[in-house]
Amino acid sequence: MKYLEHIEAVAREHHHVPAVRVSMGAELSYDEVWAASDALAAYIAAHVERGVPVMVYGNKDPFMVVGFLACMKAGCPYVPIDCVSVPAKRVASITSQITHEGSCPLVLATEDITRVEEMPPLTVLSRRDLCRIVEAGGAPERDRWIEGEDIAYILFTSGSTGAPKGVEITASCFDNFCAWDLELARFAGEGGGAIWLDQAPFSFDLSVFELAGALASGGCLYSLAFETQVSASAQLRALAESDVRIWVSTPSFAEVCLANAEFRQELLPSLRLFVFCGETLPNMVASRLLERFPEARVLNTYGPTESTVAVTSTEITPEMAAGDDPLPVGAPRPGTRLRIVDADGLDCAAGTFGEVVIEGDTVAHGYFGRDDLTSQVFGTSVVDDKPVRTYRTGDEGMLDEDGQLHFRGRLDLQVKLNGFRIELGEIEEQLRRLPEVAAAAVTAAYREGKVSHLVAHVVPSRPLEQTPFREGLALKERLKTTLPHYMIPKKVAFRESLPMTGNGKLDRRGLADTKH
């Protein structure tokens, strides 16, 4: 795998250079990361069959990065689980899905996963176990490394059936994305050694942007721990101490930072590049960033988890940001072709909106253990005389005359909120499982062209015993046991019934038009 070879070369030539640094103080150099992942990979190879998923559990811990690399070296896909944002029942659901032929899944746990209730049987390596294995040393056989169509990682995303679905990204997808990622980094004005901001949870595919780019280029991941991100003052101090040169985040995170007047070039004098992905970049956010960071450039990108993070990019100029038109998300990367199709799957003319179809060498293998779902949205094609996979995104977009993609939103029940992809059907399914709920639907509320919050429309199964406000609070507390925080509706509206259309279907448009 080229990605591992890149890191190996850096570890050999610049072994004492920091590879991962966390805002709370922990740090590992390249030689420490390489040696530790070698030793852990040897253990995994001796105890886990090649190709069997291994869970890596924690939050912004350097040993999670060690775990990712160790899995790749051992020939096993890693499954990242953020211990802060992913609730217990969701962890249990993911664990059940990756259980291999009745065996207990191996978990590399940098935090205590034994506190998670309702978990199936696990083989857990605690932090103490991991340290013991690393101290013992060792390395796997080189032929255990993943390559080609081997699965590199599995990211579980929102699923409409009420259970998360695992997106399988191959080693070749990862390598192809990484090569493009390194090209994008050149916008920062240097070849390597840059410090990359690592803010998104590792269970969110945006984090692969910096995992790939930083380590393959000899740079450093500067990880913002949960404890840092929950305090505005601590976060500002951490950013000031980071010396970050390449910023990777959702636009929403940057927008939160912009609320502080101190967030400007003087705070981050080395910052030269903003890379945004995961949701729509508002013109005002781009404009304010370019004003406050005159030495930095802004890249807007687009891509679902199923196409390895991102497949398009474009630089946003001050003139574009100051305009009234929504910002484009750019042209496709090498090895990728975009099509816009109508409801019948026929190509749309330039300037016409339709469904975005991605064809290329970073399209995922499919959904883990779900051939039924895979066959619905994945296919095959040929790009640059090479056979590739295709993915129907469910996104609405348009290609202009210059080949630039313009993204307008989701065609189905999927929405993006603060950069997180959410399947409204999954929230509805969890609501319906509650005994106090007879029927439920979830809609997204919009403000200034993007999703501001979620609204749950609930038909109660019994008369309300408290005020609607207090009943709504209790309902949201119940949901927190099964859903991540970003999927919890902000508002709960109790109704006698849900509106229907003339053909007997739920009138989602009517619900969405309700003011909340």
What do these predicted ranges mean?
Residues 1-154, 169, 176, 282-286, ...:
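AMP-binding/adenylate-forming domain of the ANL superfamily
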Residues 2-4, 100-144, 174, 297-300, ...:
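AMP-dependent adenylate-forming
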Residues 14, 260, 293, 371, ...:
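Acidic-histidine catalytic/liganding microenvironments
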Residues 21-24, 275-277, 418:
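Glycine-rich Rossmann NAD(P)(H)-binding loop
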Residues 50, 103, 243, 267-270, ...:
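Short loop/turn motifs at secondary-structure junctions
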Residues 54, 107-108, 196, 247, ...:
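Receiver (REC) domain switch-region micro-motif
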Residues 58-62, 204, 489:
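Substrate-binding/gating loop at the entrance of the active-site cleft, primarily
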Residues 63, 68, 76-95, 137-347, ...:
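Motif- and composition-driven signal specific to adenylation
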